[in-house]
Structure formats: C-alpha cells, structure tokens
Amino acid sequence: MHVYAFAASVRRTLLVTYPRTASNLLVRMLSLEEQENAISNEKGGYFFWDSFIKGRTTNSTYTPIESWTPQQTEEMQQIFQHDFNRLESTSNLAESQGKVFFAKEHVQWFTDPAAISDYLSHKDSRTPSPVNIKLPNPYGTPQGFSANNLSIFPDHYLKTWRLTFLIRHPALAFPSFYRAMRELEKEEFAQTHEICPLMELNATLRWSRLLYDWCYQHQEEPIKGCDRDIQYPLVLDAQDIAHHPAVLAKYCKLIGLNPVHLKWEWNVPDQKIQKGVEDRIGHKSPEAVMKFTLDNSSHVLKDKTPAIVDIGLERKGWDREFGISIGEQMEKWVREAMPDYTYLRAKRLRVQDA
C-alpha cells in the first residue's frame, strides 16, 4: 500500500500540523462527529499527546539523548508505543467498519526524539534513536528510515497513510504560540525553563518541510502527474481555510469526507464562555488555554488569518507586546522560517483547483 494511492487503497489520513496553525478550527469545520463515513477520536487526533507531555515532565525533550538515563529511555519507549497502539487500534476500528480514519498530529510530537535532541543541541550529526516502535505483524519487517524521514515511523509504515499538511504564516503562528506558552506558564502547566527550547523547537517549519519532501519523493509515479490542477501531497494554508470555502470542500472530497457537513458557524457552550473550562480550582486546563479563541467564538474569525502579513509591521507590535529582546528573536524565527513556508504555500491546494 502506498501513501498516495487513490481513495480505495488509502482510507486513512494524517493531517500534519504544527502549533497554532488553526488545526482545532479546521477539525471543528470538518465536523468529524457528523461524518457518517469517518472515524477519529474526540480530539480529531493528538494521539501522541501523552508522549509530548511525558517528554516534558521527564525533561527528556530538553536533555541530549546521550545523557538520558535508562529510566528515561524506558519511559519514552513505553509511552510512544502506547500512543502508537492507540492510533493503530482506532485505525483498525475504522477499517473494520469500512470507514475513513482521520487524525491530526503536530509533526514535532511524532518526530524522533534523537532528531529533536540534535536540533536543540545544534548538532550536525544524526544520533541513533532511543525509540523503536514495534509494528504489528501485518506491516512486516521494518525496512528502515530514509534521510529526510525524521519521524518515529519507518518508511514502509508511513506509506500506508495519506499524509496531508496544514501550514500558517510564521508571523501569525509563532507569536501566537509564544502567547499560549506564557499563558500555560501562568496556569502552572509550563515551567519557565521550557519556554525557550519549546519555542526553538516549534518556531520553524523544517519538520513539515522535510516530511513533505519525503512524501513527494515516495509517492507513486502515476500520481505525480495524474492531475495537473492538484499537487500531492495535499497542503492546506490556514488563510484559505478561513477565506475560501471551496478549498476545504475540495479537500474533503479528496480524502473521503463529505463536504455537506462543513461548518462556518456553531454554538458556544455556556460553560466555556469568557474563562474556559477549569480542570482544577482557579486554573484553566491546557486544552482550554490552547483553544480559548475557538471555544469563545461562534464562527470563523477571518481577521485571525489576514491575506497580507507585513513582518516589519508585526515586529513593532511584538516589541510592544513582548519587549524588544523577544521581538527581535521572534522576527529572526519568522524570517528564517519564511523560505520553508513560501515553498510549502506554493504547493497548497488552491481555489482555482477547487
């Protein structure tokens, strides 16, 4: 099975995202709970949330791999395997019912911890992975990882998925993530020492770019030129999601979802208005922090994804909001990410394609 073989042979889609790309908005618009031909989980994905949290709470994410203790290695192996098993279980449920399986995942959450360690340590060499996902028998013997596959999944496993990508302008996504991190720190869900490495890890599109290139290189030859109007793998830009309904409708058709269920308006649950859901007295849950805008809106907020973004003008706002030091660093992250964003945006599913 290959990742971009058409509908009948690939019935599971993984939407590859990074923080603050409006992925929660996209999932709400897709109305997965009303898609009679699809199965997901209650979050529309995030199967590797527990692995992400474990990496933080054990400090494994911020510790060079060669300095991991045996306990850290064992814990991370177990949690990645556990999350993978849940992903496969839900996928198998969808397959048993003849339905499409849809999941979204931040690319950093299923990236090899060794690749993350090398990146945060600014190492050019490739450290061997401490994580070895055990695949079910139907997938056969692992056949290795190609150079630009920095995920925890071997090549032949990734080929059983239709990978699609969601991107958002770095000047919108990165400062939004920083605001969220500061709010999580305020709510005692993030520690001060985490903010810098988490920003460095997430204020880049390199992970999405590498995986996109892997997908393109490994898709079946007939698909590379079978439709001149549509480029594979599919890429969505958050700006198009908010402003061009035809693009999202086309995306639905291409991955096996029914566009009739798409939503641009919804009701706001009373208990989430203003302050969000609290998981313990006086503190919002992490989910409430990350979804605050979405949970307190009744429709798509188009002004959150403007068509034109002036980085220089945004920089002035960052200086006022974050201080000059962070404003300067934010601009550096954004400008360094722009080549990858521009590259991926040029590949996006467009209005004229729809």
Please place each PLM-identified region on the residue numbering.
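PAPS-dependent sulfotransferase catalytic core
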Residues: M1-N92, K99, E105
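Loop/turn-to-beta-strand initiation segments
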Residues: Q97-F101, R162
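PAPS-dependent sulfotransferases, especially Golgi type II membrane carbohydrate sulfotransferases
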Residues: H2-R12, N258-A354
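Soluble or luminal CAZymes and related metallo-dependent hydrolases
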Residues: W68-D83, F145, E200-W207, F322-Q329, ...
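Amphipathic alpha-helical segments that form well-ordered structural scaffolds
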Residues: L25, M29, W207-C215, K250, ...
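PAPS/PAP-binding and catalytic site of the sulfotransferase fold
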Residues: A22-E34, V235-H261, V277-S297
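PAPS-dependent sulfotransferase catalytic domain
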Residues: H106-L262
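Phosphate-binding/switch loop-helix module in NTP-utilizing enzymes
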Residues: Q71-Q97, F110, I116-T127, L150-P154
